Amino acid sequence: MTEKRTGGGQRRIAWVLLLASAAAVVVTGLFGTVLVLSQLGGGPGAWTPSFWLRLVAAAALTIVSLMLRSLRWIFLLRRAHVRIPIRDAYIGYFAGLSLLLTPFLLGEIALRALVHRARGRVPAATVVVVNLWERLLDLAALGVITGLTAVVLGRLHIWSAALLVLALLTAVPAVLRAGRIAAEWLARPAAHLFDKSLAPDTGRLSDGRTWLAGMVVSLAAWVLPGLGFWIVAAGWGRPISLVTAEYAYAASSSLGGLVLAPGGVLVAGASLLNELQAAGLGGTAAALSVFGIRLATVGVATALGGVFLLVHLRTPASATAEHFDEIADAYDVQIPESRRDALLGTKTRLMRDVIERHLSGGRRGLDAGCGQGWYVRRMRELGFDVDGIDASAGQVALAARHIGTNGRVRVGSVLNVPEPPASYDFVYTINVLHHLASVDEQRRAFAELLRVLRPGGLLFVHEINTRNVLFRFYMGYVFPSLNCIDEGVERWLLPQQMAMYTDAPLVDLRYFTFLPDFLPQPLVRLLAPLERLLESSPFAPYSAHYMTVLRKL
C-alpha cells in the first residue's frame, strides 16, 4: 500500500512539473514576442483585417494538417496491433497537443499514454513508441522538404544537405529497425510510470510499407503549414516565393525538433525571422509574420488540445461490448435509405438464386446477426422460413417490431447460436463477422454457424470487400469517423482468404456494388449502368461488397 501511495505521489509531482514547465514556456514565448514587437513598433495598428484573415487561412491549414497527422497516428497504432475505437484514438491524439509546450515531448507523450490507457486500455509502452515513431516521421518529412526546397533555391548548404541525407537514410531497412529498437528501449522507463506492460509489439512499424505510407502522409501534413506561412508572409506587399516559405518553415521546424525545444519556442521563431530577413522582408512585417504563423500553428494546436482534453474529462470511453444496444435507435439512419433498400434487394436476390440452384427443398434458414430484422422479413416474403438472432437486445426488440408476429427473433450470437446441431438448411450472416475481436473468434464463429447447418447446407457470408485500397481507407478511417455503426476496430475478412477461417468448400462467390453509400440518389441512378458494367467486368473483385457461399460436408 505504501509503495502504491509513493508511486501515486511521484506521478502527481511529475504532472505538476510538466504543467509548470508548459506554463513557463508559454510565458517565455509571449514575453519574447511582446519584446520583439515593441522594439519594432509592431503595435495594434499594424494588425490590419487583412492580417487576421491571413491568420485564419493559416490556422485552417494547420487544422487540416493536424487531421492528417491524427489519421497517421491511428494508422501507426493499428500497425502496432492496437485496436481502440477511432473516436477515442482521436481524443487521445489531440488531447496530447495541450501539453505540446513541455520539454522533450514529455507532456505530450505522458498525456497521450494516460488518455489511451483510460479510453482503450492501450499499453503505455506502445503509446510511447508510436509517439516517438511519429516524431521521427515528422523529422524525416521536414528534412525532405528542407533539402528539396534548398535544391530548388540553390541554397543546399551543409545544414540542409545533412537534413536531406538523414531523412533519406530512414528509408534504409537496417536504420528503420535500429530506430524502432531505440524507441522501444526509450519507452520502457517512461511507460513504467503508468503500467508494467510487457514490451510492445511494434515490429511492423519498421516495415517498409508502413514507413512509406507514414512518409506520404507526413509530407502532405508538413507542406500545409509552410503554405500557411507563405500566405501570412506574402501579404505585406513584398514578394516572397512559396518555395522560400516552405524552406523557411521546414528548416526552422527541423531545428526546433532536433534540439527538442518545447513547441520550437524561441528556436523556430528566431530561425524563421532570419529567413524572412534574408528574403528581404524585415522589420515589423517579418516579426508579425513569425508571430502570426506561430499563433496559427503552435497556438491553434495547443488550444485544440485543450478542447479535446476537456472532451476526454467529460465523456466516457466507447463501450464496444454494448455498442449496438447504444446505437439501436439511430442505426438505420447511418446509411441512406435508398442504398439500404438497394443492398437489401441485391443480397436477398443473390441468396434466393443460390438456394434454389443448390438446395432441393431446403427452406429453413437463420439470419445470424439480424440487426433490426429487415433481411429476415424480406427472406420470409420470398417464401423462406427464417429465424433471426442478434447479440444486441436493443436490436432484437426493434427486429421483433419490424417483423411482426410471424417471425422468430431472439438474443444470440454467432459465437453461441441457441439452436441444436443440424437445425437449418442455410445460414447467412451480413456484415457481422468483421465486428469480432480477433481472428480466433472469427474462426469460432464459422465453426458455430456450420454446426447448426444440416449436412449439405449452405453458409452465406456477406462482408465488406476491402481488397480495394480506397474502399479499405474509407471503411477503416472515414466511415467510422462520420458514422456510429463501425468504430474503427473491425477485422476485415477478404474473400480469397476464407481458408483462414474454415475448411468448408466454396460453392459460389459474388462481387457487387461500386457506388459509395453517400452518393445522392439521382447520381446513383445516373451511374447505375456503369456499376452493372463493373460488376460483370474483370474489376469485379474490387467491388465494395461480396457474398461467399460455403457448403457443410
Task: Give the residues covered by each predicted segment.
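Short alpha-helix
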Residues: 489-505
